[in-house]
Amino acid sequence: MFRQFYNMGKNPFSKGLSCADAFKTDDLAQVHARLDHLSRVGGIGLLTADPGTGKTFAARTWADRLNPNTTKLVYMCMSTLTNNDFYRQLARGFGIQMAYKKCDLFRDIQECVRSLACERRMRVVVVIDEAHMLHTSVLRDLQMLTNFEMDSKDYLSVVLVGHSVLAQQLSRQPYESLRQRLVVTYRMQGLGEAAARDYVRSMLARSGADPDLFDDAALAAAHGSCGGSIRRLNSIVTNALTIGAQQKSMHIDAEMVRSATEELSLF
C-alpha cells in the first residue's frame, strides 16, 4: 500500500535486500577488511553482534564479493547439530561423498581442502552462521580442522558468525587453544544515530521516494527505539510508512514513528 502512495519502486527496508543495494556502514567496512585479511592468511575469525545488527548480511555482502574461480566458499547456517552431523553437512558443502565414520569424514574434508589450496591454488573459506549455537564438541574440533601439515600450513579460513555471547563463551579456559587461533575478531556496533538517519534517507532515495519523507525528530525517534538494530529499524520505518500512507500524509513525524513502535511492541 505505502509503496504506491510514496512512489516507491520497491520496499527498500525489506529483508530481501540485495548485496548490491547494501548501505555502506562503518561496521560493514570493518567486517569486509577483517574477512579479506582472514581469507588471505587462513585461520579462524570471529564476527559477533547483538541480534538484528546485521552480522549475517555483513558476511553475505563480503561473500558476494568473492571470486568463485579463486575462492571456494562453504556457508553453513544449521548450527544445532551433533558433531557427526556437522561434519556431514560440511562434507556436503564441499561436494564430498560422505563417509560413515567421523574420522573418515574429517580426513576426507582435510584432503579436499588441501587439494583445493595446493593443486588448484584456491582460497578455501567456511562461514558458520549462528555459531553461538554450536555444540561444545564442534567448537573444540575446529582447531583440529584448521591444522594442516603438522600445524605449519593455513589452507582453510573459518568464519564464526554469532551473537555476542559466543565471544564470552570462547573467553573461558576450555577454549584457550581455539581462542589462540583467532586471527581476526570483530564485534559489530550497530547503527549510531547519524548512520541510522543516513541509512533511512539513502534507502528512501534509492527506492524513488522523497529522502526527506521522515523529519529529523522522526528519525531520532526511530533510532532511539531500535537500539542500533538495523532489523528493528527496518520494521519501525516500514510500519511508520504504512501508518503515513493510511493517513495520506506526505510527511512522517515523530508521533507516527512512536505509534509504529508501539504497534510492534518494541518498548
Predicted regions and their residues:
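C-terminal alpha-helical "lid" subdomain
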Residues: 198, 205-267
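Walker A/P-loop nucleotide-binding motif
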Residues: 41-61
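A short, basic N-terminal segment
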Residues: 1-41, 266
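Mid-core helix/loop region of P-loop NTP-binding domains shared across ATPases and GTPases
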Residues: 82-85, 98-141, 150-154, 191-196, ...
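Conserved AAA+ ATPase "SRH/arginine-finger" region at the nucleotide-binding site
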Residues: 76-80, 170, 183-196
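Conserved NTP-binding/hydrolysis module of P-loop NTPases
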Residues: 8-15, 71-73, 81-100
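Short regulatory helix/loop adjacent to the ATP-binding pocket of P-loop NTPases
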Residues: 63-66, 166-181
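Conserved AAA+ ATPase "sensor/coupling" helix adjacent to the nucleotide-binding pocket
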Residues: 92-94, 164-165, 173, 194-210
